[in-house]
Amino acid sequence: MAPITALGYGAFKVGRNQKTKYGHSYELPTEQESDRLLNSVLDLGITVIDTAPSYGLSEERIGRYLSHRREEFFLSTKAGETFEGESRYDYSKDAIVASVHSSLQRLRTDVLDCVFVHSHSDDVAVLTETDAVETLLDLKAKGLTKLVGFSGYSCLSIRNCLPQVDAIMVEFNVNNTIHAGVMQEAADRGVKVFVKKGMSSGSVPAQQAIPFVLENTSVTTLLLSSLSVEHLKENIWRTSDEYKLR
């Protein structure tokens, strides 16, 4: 498994620009632009790339342009949500298994570093009324993923999943610190903490957002999404040396 850097790349914008939660619209990058961007992420020293089946072309493009560098980065994806104009959720065993196998094919890899349950807003029900986590644990035992994670919304679901998972993904930023307590509980258990929406979907400037998140010692990786190599360079510059690797 590749070293895990404090800054990771969230590859949403590489593949999807419909029904996003960002405060601005954007054009999808071309194939050539995607190639340059994704390889630049690794060239800049970022070793964590996160994607999902619901991110449009994201998985396919990562597989196309980074499979030859697979040993250089920690690759996470998700299962449970798909998107074709609208989000659809299916946490059945068959759907989770099919999702992971499809992701492996699109990403052109034999094993994933982590697969997160991609929960909808009723994440307690996803955790307690489906076999999503258990199915991923079975796939982990079969060697298809090294870690199992849960991407959720409520403190209750995150706290309840901790005995089962290796990683969590939660929102945490200057405007939303509700998960701070459960993030620390996760870290105390040795569960990796991945932070999404660290810049509050672009409403908090990077120079304020990045130090705020990374000064929290429970955080493993802050995921950032950008289509600009220059912005990525600036964000890395804002990351103190003591935070480079977690």
Task: Name each model feature, range by range.
Residues 43-46, 109-112, 145, 165, ...:
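A structural motif
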Residues 9, 41, 49, 62, ...:
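Conserved, mostly hydrophobic/aromatic
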Residues 120-246:
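Beta/alpha (TIM)-barrel catalytic core signal, keyed to glycine-rich beta->alpha loops juxtaposed to Asp/Glu
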Residues 14-32, 82-97, 119, 123-125, ...:
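Active-site mouth loops of central-metabolism enzymes
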Residues 24-41, 91-108, 151-160, 205-212:
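Short, acidic/polar
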Residues 3, 63-74, 104-110, 140, ...:
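Acidic (Asp/Glu)-rich catalytic clusters
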Residues 1-73:
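N-terminal binding-site loop/beta-alpha segment at the start of enzyme catalytic domains
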Residues 104-123:
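Active-site groove signature of glycoside hydrolases
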